[in-house]
Amino acid sequence: MLLRYRIPEILRIRSPLKKWYSTVKPMSAAEEMRLKISQEQTRKAIQERIDKIPIENYRNFSIVAHVDHGKSTLSDRLLELTGVIQPGMKAQVLDKLEVERERGITVKAQTVSMFYNDGNQDYLLHLVDTPGHVDFRAEVSRSYASCGGALLLVDASQGVQAQTVANFYLAYSMGLKLIPIINKIDLDSANIPGAMEQVETTFELDSNDCIAVSAKTGLNVEQIIPSIIKNIPAPNCDETKPLRALLVDSWHDPYVGVVMLLHIVDGKLKKGMKIVSAHSNKAYDVKEVGIMYPDRTPMDHIKAGQVAYIIPGMKNPREALVGDTFYQLGKSEGLEPLPGFEEPKPMVFVGAFPADGREFNAMDDQMQNLVLNDRAVTLEQETSNALGLGWRLGFLGSLHASVFKERLEKEYGAQIILTAPTVPYKIFYKNGTEKVITNPDEFPDNTRHHDVEKYLEPYVEAIMTVPEEYMGNVMTLCLNNRGEQKDIEYLTTGQVLLKYEIPLSQLVEDFFGKLKGCTKGYASLDYEEAGYKKSDIVKLELCVNGEPQDALTTIIHKSQAQARGKEYVSKFKKYLKNQLFEVAIQAKVNNKVVARETIKARRKDVTQRLHAADISRYKKLLERQKEGKKQMKATGKVHIKNDAYQAFLRRDD
């Protein structure tokens, strides 16, 4: 496809992409030909420049940072410094998704190639931009595997935060060389010595190695790349060996299909080659190879040490599994797959239903398209008595679910109802069988309850950084959420690092929102899996006139059943209208009522036309009305609109 913008021939200074609006006249055939020739010359010049750079001059690095510490802004400054983009181009070049820009988070791993000349020789740098949130930890670890080091970014005004700590330990465990960067030194609230001291005490990195910068203004950013070249080792790769490539990430392009981001560990890869997956043993024809500069730029070939893209002609995006190894077809004998492959494992499950049931078919297509771009989401159809046809979705975490819902609404304009999140519970039966349940409907009913030997629920180790003055509030919050304290560490500048083991089910129920609330927004949170523990869990059903509302059924700890039941019945009562008969709203556990609310019958004055003295007729009409209401209560059915479920399930209520 011919690009309608000119790529400059000077490689060290890259002009911004020109925006073409409908008012611009179309190019003539001669202009298109000249542009095509110019692009081809530029592409060849880039390829020749890469081929001249020895692998000893490659540097692959990432940026480790807490959310909102300036990772995307620093990336922009580095791209400007190396001439990949010009100053003034759109901010957050590496954040491709709209939701990434709006939330200020990175969801998909991205990369960009940069050239740097220190006056003596050329260097090829690959910046691998990774998600920072624990929900996307699988993508983070695969991205780190393609790097030799990382920039450890710390906000000078906020200091070390939870996500920084968690990602530091992940990077450190993978042997990455870390360069500490103190960012936002231009702020009035910046405490540079305090941030440096935190880096030294928390991570045992020499504070003298810290580089103090302002990514916003560009102050001192020019010191970073020389430090990368000096401290981060070149990739340990060999171009002469048979091809081995690690899949770092992938996405679906509507025009070319699946695009895969690969770290070429050994060998060389070019258009027309056949490659094979180590995991599935499926073969693919490579349609295109290239580098991200910052967008896709086709090359003749890519080689060992590079982090680059290929278009493999893959039909099903779910075949692209992060961490998979690819070989050249017919030349894989005796080769070992690269370490680190693991299937995405959903840990949070929700029921999803269209707000308007008539839109199911259209929304099903939209849902399938979105899942194409996110292989970590599991999708299967399910039916609810209350909400009709829908889907059961599995996500890596609550943020992952929230991002998916937001993308569905923004990219397709869909209105969707999500049920309360459920985590995977393990059930061990007395006959030796084991079952993992992700839906409250799968929970054993009363007839099978005595067959169960034990229930297990997943736990996580939560890492929180909070101001010392709010430590008591946070400890109370953790205790109320069945948390168990594991460690407490006093950082400098009045910050405390808390480690708690907390049930995952408690964490996905807006724990982070409550944490922010009790610390006035100053706390940060990260977590990692801590295995399964025995637990006394039960199924809490919400019934309206004896009819269970499956969309509102949830699994909780027995100690919380009564309090949660009272909360549910009083909350749902607000969204039901009065009927001509009395309506009972009950919360049940093991068929026993633990909480109840009653909606009084709508009263009609059947005696308004009677004479005051007609007592017998008065009593007769009231008795008849009473009998009618009794019969209606026994046989009548309460019609509940989807709006009521949607309002009940909305978290901000």
From Swiss-Prot:
Pfam families: EFG_C (PF00679), GTP_EFTU (PF00009), GTP_EFTU_D2 (PF03144), LepA_C (PF06421). GTP binds at residues 65-72, 129-133, 183-186. It is found in: Mitochondrion inner membrane. Its EC number is 3.6.5.-. It comes from the Eukaryota. GO terms for cellular component: mitochondrial inner membrane; mitochondrial matrix. Residues 56-236 form the tr-type G domain. GO terms for biological process: positive regulation of translation; translation. Keywords: GTP-binding, Hydrolase, Membrane, Mitochondrion, Mitochondrion inner membrane, Nucleotide-binding, Protein biosynthesis. HAMAP family: LepA. Belongs to the TRAFAC class translation factor GTPase superfamily. Classic translation factor GTPase family. LepA subfamily. This protein may be expected to contain an N-terminal transit peptide but none has been predicted. This is Translation factor GUF1, mitochondrial. The lineage of its organism: Eukaryota, Fungi, Dikarya, Ascomycota, Saccharomycotina.
